[in-house]
Amino acid sequence: MDEYYKLGARFAKWRAVYSILSNQPSEQCIKANAHALARYAAIVQEAKMVPIVEPEVLMDGDHTIDKCYEVTSKVLIECFKELKINNVKLEGTVLKPNMILPGSSCKKKANTDEIAKKTLDCLKKTMPKEVPGVAFLSGGQSEVEATKNLNAINKINDTNFNFTFSYGR
C-alpha cells in the first residue's frame, strides 16, 4: 500500500459480491465477505488512504425488490459491524453499494420512485451517520437508468448523507 500511496493513490476499492438465490447468500458468506471488506478498509486507512467499501448485491435473478432490500440490509449491517470491530474510521470511508432493485428477471418491475424510496430507507436504517458519502454503483443498470434512480434518491434525501455515482467505463 505504501508504494501505491507514493505513486499518488489516495483511494482504494475492494468489492464483495452477493448473489440472491433461494438459500443465498448464506449467513457465513455475508460474515466472511464483511470481514474481508473490513480488514481491507483497515489496511487502506493505515496507509493513509480512503477505503471505498463495495458490498454489491447483484441484480441477476428473479428476486423481488423486497428481497433485495432484505439481503442488502443484512449485508450492510454486517459490513458496518465488522468495520467497527476492525477500528475503521467510518468518517474516512466511502460506501459503494447497490441500489435496491428487483432482479433483472423479475416479472414485477419497480419504478424510479419505489427504487429511490427503498434505497434511501435501507441506508437510513443500516448506515451509521458517520459515513460521509455513498457512491452508487450501476449494478447492471444502464447508465441512464442508474442516473435517473440516483436523481430520484437525491430529490427525496432528507439525511446528511452525500450521494453520488461511481459507474461508467
Regions found by a protein language model. Give the residues of each.
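Helix-rich catalytic cores of soluble enzyme domains
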Residues: 2-83
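Active-site capping/gating regions of soluble enzymes
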Residues: 63-169
